[in-house]
């Protein structure tokens, strides 16, 4: 690294980074909120709608190797500035220039690149400024606050959509990542550079450090956390991308409206993931991370199928099952990330975090598209059975992961 790791008290910076992350994520659910009006306006299939939702993860995957490789060489604070700017520009492009499928994909890719420049670099900002003994709990708070940002994203986007139109959603929410950038600029001091080291000297092997990734994957603990995070992210982001549309179908199927706007409900449900992630990490520290992850993934699969089969039922049952599913999806989120950070060797921690994030958001890339493809394949949005198949297509991966790792003996270790 090209900077001195001067450790400071965590309570100086953790709340600041939690606030910044919440602002940076305000654009995350804009498309999920506007999916239905844009699908009708642009005459999109469910697969196309899912691909636009997946585009943010494509942008993330393209940018995250560069962003995380740089955090091992320069202060992650600088990467954060670039990420905030890209998020701002991507949302503005959606609000002013998007006219159909391909233009929306382009701007969502830019938004994803912005997320790559803020999410894991934001975690690196914290890890460079914390004592090792503090990391696990503060990581759990940081990852849990992903739900705060996405929850407010649903709510604010829904309120703006109801008051104005879909374009206004992106134009106003673009202020979120810009604000995150300014928070880090003014409230997070830079790390002190080490004298005598200059130049980035980045090569493709630095951006895609395959040899280093192989070292990481040869560590059974690290590999398990990474693949677990991939299946977790596939289910999580598919569910978040299609939850508003599913609630819309449920309202039609049951013949009655929900007690709140469906976008507001989606936001509130996301908030349940925050304590779930934090408390889940505390439970994992007591019962063993791997045992907890296995239990949560199986429970999440059951809750997801139960939610999908309840589409014609009363709103209170649907909302209760959606909350249960959200809690179980997020209950192992911090545990998976903390486990990876704690198990990765210090000299390749940045690369390990990059692979973890790359694989996780690779799952996020696949999830919404798989969900939309299965909807088209089995009857489209108007079929209750199609929603069951679509949910089944995303929860099955966690079950397969648990079965595989149990066979390999991973779940019997702490």
What positions do the PLM features span?
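Extracytoplasmic gate region of multi-pass secondary transporters
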Residues: 31-32, 221-269
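Helix-loop-helix hairpin linking two adjacent transmembrane segments in secondary transporters
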Residues: 142-189
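Flexible cytoplasmic inter-helical loops of multi-pass small-molecule transporters
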Residues: 188-214, 414
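C-terminal transmembrane helical hairpin of 12-TM major facilitator-type secondary transporters
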Residues: 290-336
């Amino acid at each position: 690294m090209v900077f001195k790791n001067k450790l400071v008290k965590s309570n100086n910076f953790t709340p600041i980074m939690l606030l910044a992350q919440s602002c940076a994520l305000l654009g995350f659910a804009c498309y999920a909120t506007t999916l239905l009006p844009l699908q009708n306006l642009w005459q999109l299939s469910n697969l196309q709608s899912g691909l636009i939702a997946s585009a943010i993860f494509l942008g993330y995957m393209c940018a995250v190797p560069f962003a995380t490789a740089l955090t091992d060489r320069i202060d992650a604070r600088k990467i954060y500035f670039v990420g905030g700017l890209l998020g701002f520009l991507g949302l503005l492009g959606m609000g002013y220039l998007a006219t159909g499928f391909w233009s929306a994909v382009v701007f969502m890719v830019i938004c994803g690149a912005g997320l790559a420049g803020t999410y894991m670099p934001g975690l690196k900002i914290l890890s460079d400024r914390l004592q090792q003994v503090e990391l696990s709990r503060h990581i759990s708070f940081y990852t849990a606050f992903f739900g705060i940002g996405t929850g407010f994203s649903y709510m604010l986007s829904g309120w703006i959509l109801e008051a104005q139109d879909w374009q206004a959603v992106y134009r106003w929410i673009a202020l979120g990542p810009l604000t995150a950038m300014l928070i880090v600029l003014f409230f997070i001091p830079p790390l002190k550079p080490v004298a005598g080291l200059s130049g980035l000297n980045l090569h493709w092997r630095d951006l895609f450090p395959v040899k280093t990734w192989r070292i990481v994957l040869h560590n059974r603990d690290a590999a398990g956390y990474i693949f677990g995070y991939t299946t977790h992210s596939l289910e999580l982001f598919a569910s978040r991308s299609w939850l508003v549309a599913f609630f819309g179908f449920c309202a039609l199927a049951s013949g009655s409206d929900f007690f709140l706007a469906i976008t507001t409900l989606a936001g509130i449900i996301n908030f349940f993931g925050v304590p779930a992630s934090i408390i889940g990490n505390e439970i994992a520290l007591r019962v063993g991370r791997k045992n907890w992850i296995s239990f949560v993934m199986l429970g999440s699969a059951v809750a997801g199928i139960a939610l999908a089969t309840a589409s014609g039922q009363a709103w209170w049952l649907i909302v209760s099952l959606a909350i249960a599913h959200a809690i179980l999806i997020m209950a192992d989120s911090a545990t998976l990330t903390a486990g990876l950070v704690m198990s990765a060797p210090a000299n390749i921690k940045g690369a390990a975090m990059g692979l973890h994030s790359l694989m996780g958001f690779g799952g996020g890339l696949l999830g919404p598209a798989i969900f939309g493809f299965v909807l088209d394949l089995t009857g489209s949005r108007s079929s209750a059975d199609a929603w069951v198949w679509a949910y089944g297509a995303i929860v099955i991966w966690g079950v397969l992961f648990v079965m595989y790792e149990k066979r390999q003996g991973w779940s019997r270790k702490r």
